[in-house]
C-alpha cells in the first residue's frame, strides 16, 4: 500500500474551490432520493454515492463528485463504475475498494481517482460477533 497517494488537505481544498454552488447535495440510492426535485439537483453540486449516479445521468445531471465506497459495486457493476467515474468531475474511491480491485482497476483508480483512507471496515456479523454485542 505504500504506492497509494491518499487524498490530502490540498485535494480537499481543491474540491472546495471547484464547487459551483453554495450547497452540495449528497445523493444516495433509494426511493426517497428520487423525490428530490430535478430542478434542485440541476442547480446544485451533487455528490453521487455508489449506484445513485445512474439516476443523475439518466436526467443529464453530471455529478460534482462520484464516491465509490462498496467494493461489491465495482465487482458487480464495473462498467457502471467506469461510466460514472468518467462522467463526474471528480471521483473518490475508498481504500477498501482499491485493495480489492483487480490490477487493471487499481491502475485506473490511481490515475483517475482520489483515494480515501477508511474510517471503518465493513465486517460481516458472525455468531461470535452477535454474541459479543449482545452481552
Descriptions of predicted regions:
Residues 42-45, 51-135:
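Acidic/Gly/His-enriched mid-domain segments of enzyme catalytic cores or analogous surface patches
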Residues 1-26, 31-43, 58, 86-91, ...:
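N-terminal donor/sugar-recognition subdomains of glycan-related enzymes
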Amino acid at each position: 500500500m505504500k504506492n497509494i497517494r491518499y487524498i490530502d488537505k490540498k485535494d480537499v481544498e481543491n474540491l472546495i474551490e471547484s464547487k459551483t454552488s453554495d450547497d452540495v447535495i449528497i445523493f444516495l440510492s433509494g426511493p426517497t432520493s428520487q423525490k428530490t426535485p430535478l430542478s434542485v439537483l440541476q442547480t446544485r453540486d451533487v455528490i453521487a454515492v455508489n449506484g445513485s449516479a445512474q439516476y443523475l445521468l439518466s436526467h443529464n445531471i453530471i455529478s460534482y463528485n462520484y464516491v465509490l465506497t462498496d467494493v461489491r459495486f465495482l465487482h458487480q457493476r464495473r462498467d457502471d463504475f467506469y461510466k460514472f467515474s468518467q462522467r463526474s468531475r471528480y471521483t473518490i474511491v475508498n481504500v477498501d475498494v482499491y485493495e480489492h480491485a483487480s490490477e487493471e482497476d487499481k491502475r485506473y483508480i490511481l490515475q483517475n481517482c482520489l483515494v480515501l483512507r477508511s474510517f471503518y471496515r465493513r465486517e460481516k456479523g458472525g455468531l461470535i460477533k452477535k454474541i459479543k454485542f449482545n452481552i
